[in-house]
């Protein structure tokens, strides 16, 4: 388990500070399989996970949903046959917060033991 995945999420408000450029460079190194996507006026973390079939993809989607519910921080999830796209960003503040990187690391942990991964 990575230190980032073990970190605690904090309550996030609309006026919470977004990660700085320096923090962004440091944190993205801890989740190297994630991409930073710029959408409109904000950045998001995104990764595609491949599975052998829809059933495995759906089970992974539900597992990500469960960890999101535990901390009250929710991603965008797109479930397709054999593929799940997970996108983390802090909706309230329209950008990236440390919580997004923590949850991306936790998503990677789930993926490491997910059934049916390609």
Curated annotation (Swiss-Prot):
<protein>
    <recommendedName>
        <fullName>Putative pterin-4-alpha-carbinolamine dehydratase</fullName>
        <ecNumber>4.2.1.96</ecNumber>
    </recommendedName>
</protein>
<keyword id="KW-0456">Lyase</keyword>
<dbReference type="Pfam" id="PF01329">
    <property type="entry name" value="Pterin_4a"/>
</dbReference>
<dbReference type="GO" id="GO:0008124">
    <property type="term" value="F:4-alpha-hydroxytetrahydrobiopterin dehydratase activity"/>
</dbReference>
<dbReference type="InterPro" id="IPR050376">
    <property type="entry name" value="Pterin-4-alpha-carb_dehyd"/>
</dbReference>
<dbReference type="InterPro" id="IPR001533">
    <property type="entry name" value="Pterin_deHydtase"/>
</dbReference>
<dbReference type="GO" id="GO:0006729">
    <property type="term" value="P:tetrahydrobiopterin biosynthetic process"/>
</dbReference>
<dbReference type="InterPro" id="IPR036428">
    <property type="entry name" value="PCD_sf"/>
</dbReference>
<comment type="similarity">
    <text>Belongs to the pterin-4-alpha-carbinolamine dehydratase family.</text>
</comment>
């Amino acid at each position: 388990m990575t230190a980032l995945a073990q970190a605690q999420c904090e309550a996030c408000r609309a006026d919470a500070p977004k990660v700085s450029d320096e923090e962004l460079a440091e944190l993205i190194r801890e989740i190297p399989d994630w991409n930073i996507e710029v959408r409109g006026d904000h950045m998001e973390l995104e990764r595609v996970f491949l599975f052998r079939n829809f059933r495995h993809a759906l089970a992974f989607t539900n597992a990500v949903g469960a960890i999101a519910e535990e901390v009250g921080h929710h991603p965008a999830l797109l479930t397709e046959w054999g593929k799940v796209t997970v996108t983390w960003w802090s909706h309230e503040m329209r950008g990236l917060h440390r919580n997004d990187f923590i949850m991306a690391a936790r998503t990677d942990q789930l993926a490491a033991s997910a059934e049916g991964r390609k």
